[in-house]
């Protein structure tokens, strides 16, 4: 196994585009095998969002961003790294496409547009809609996305914008359409043809969803109605996407947080810094993204539905780890042994299944509640 210094040194020497090319080959094979089917509404969405991977007060490199932290002991300059990631939302499972670091002196949208252009060049037919949070509801992002032949979707939550004021006034004058979904009861409004956003070259569409669902409070165990008010702005016309499709695409934005950043940081330790250099940190994150995509594809495409119902991805990862360490020589602890017994014999090949069973039963995880359909 390579040491931490070796991992950092090698990642600093590797070109990031070479790792991106391998990830693109993985996408190409999955697409050819029809493993990336679109959702029920037929539109593939690429979610864009930023993530902060590292922050400290001492070390600084050429790719570090700076901010001033105000504290009781005075102001301190903090150095940190942020990047924009793009994740493809499909009908089967999400797939991370690419990562672009935010350079000093630029904002998140500038890095997102650079990442968007690279995705359109290398993944021209991978997605139909580029979606983001409220920060992406900007005219430069919408105009650039439309100029490349894609549609844009973002959360609209700035109460001072004329577009949101006009949409809310129309909602007060128009009766809502009630829809029962898996999330609960929703009251929906859908208006298109807004021209009160003069910086945007095309007329936009506003979709509002007031969702009510029952939640059980952890403190007293009582059920309580929770109301959430969501508003999205998009360039998708009503003839291309229904109201329910826009709502589902808007909620799919959380997949990059729950199944993207959360998975990579907590289970894959993608934020670990082996070497504080911009290229080394970027390459290691791209390698982690590639490993995550490979393991997810193996779990969904190579395992039978019955096995996926019994074991989750964490248990399968323990099986990988058990097989890896079972074939490594284990150095004996204590005083130096004789030369002929310096290392213990590795486990024989036929004992791999025993190591798998021990890895699974050591710390069992709860099985999945629902069985997934068989792969196409």
Language-model features, listed with the residues they occupy:
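Electropositive, glycine- and tryptophan-enriched low-complexity nucleic-acid-binding patches
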Residues: 66-127
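Domain-level cores of phosphate- or acyl-group-handling catalytic modules
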Residues: 106-163
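Short amphipathic alpha-helical "interface-anchor" segments enriched in bulky aromatics
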Residues: 240-274
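A short, flexible helix-boundary coil/loop motif
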Residues: 180-195, 265-376
């Amino acid at each position: 196994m390579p040491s931490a210094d070796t991992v950092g040194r090698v990642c600093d020497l590797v070109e990031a585009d070479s790792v991106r090319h391998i990830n693109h080959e993985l996408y190409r094979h999955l697409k050819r095998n029809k493993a990336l089917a679109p959702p029920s509404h037929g539109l593939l969405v690429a979610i864009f969002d930023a993530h902060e991977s590292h922050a400290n007060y001492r070390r600084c490199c050429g790719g570090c961003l700076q901010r001033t932290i105000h504290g009781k002991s005075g102001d301190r300059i903090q150095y940190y790294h942020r990047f924009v990631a793009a994740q493809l939302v499909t009908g089967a499972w999400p797939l991370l496409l690419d990562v672009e670091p935010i350079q000093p002196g630029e904002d998140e949208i500038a890095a997102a547009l650079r990442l968007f252009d690279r995705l359109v060049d290398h993944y021209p037919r991978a997605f139909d809609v580029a979606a983001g949070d409220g920060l992406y509801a900007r005219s430069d992002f919408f105009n650039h996305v439309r100029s490349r032949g894609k549609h844009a979707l973002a959360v609209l939550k700035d109460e001072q914008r004329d577009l949101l004021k006009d949409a809310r006034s129309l909602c007060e004058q128009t009766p809502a359409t009630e829809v029962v979904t898996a999330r609960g009861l929703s009251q929906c409004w859908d208006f298109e043809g807004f021209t009160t956003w003069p910086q945007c070259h095309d007329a936009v569409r506003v979709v509002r969803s007031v969702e009510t669902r029952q939640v059980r409070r952890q403190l007293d165990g009582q059920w309580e109605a929770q109301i959430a008010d969501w508003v999205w702005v998009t360039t998708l016309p009503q003839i291309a996407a229904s109201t329910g499709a826009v709502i589902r695409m808007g909620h799919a934005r959380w997949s990059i947080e729950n199944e993207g950043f959360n998975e990579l940081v907590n289970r894959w330790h993608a934020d670990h810094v082996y070497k504080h250099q911009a290229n080394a940190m970027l390459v290691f994150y791209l390698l982690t993204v590639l490993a995550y995509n490979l393991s997810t594809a193996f779990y969904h495409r190579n395992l039978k539905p019955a096995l996926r119902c019994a074991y989750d991805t964490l248990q399968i990862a323990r099986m990988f780890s058990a097989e890896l360490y079972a074939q490594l020589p284990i150095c004996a602890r204590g005083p130096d042994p004789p030369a002929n017994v310096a290392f213990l014999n590795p486990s024989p090949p036929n004992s791999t299944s025993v190591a798998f069973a021990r890895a699974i039963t050591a710390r069992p995880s709860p099985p999945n509640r629902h069985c997934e359909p068989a792969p196409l």
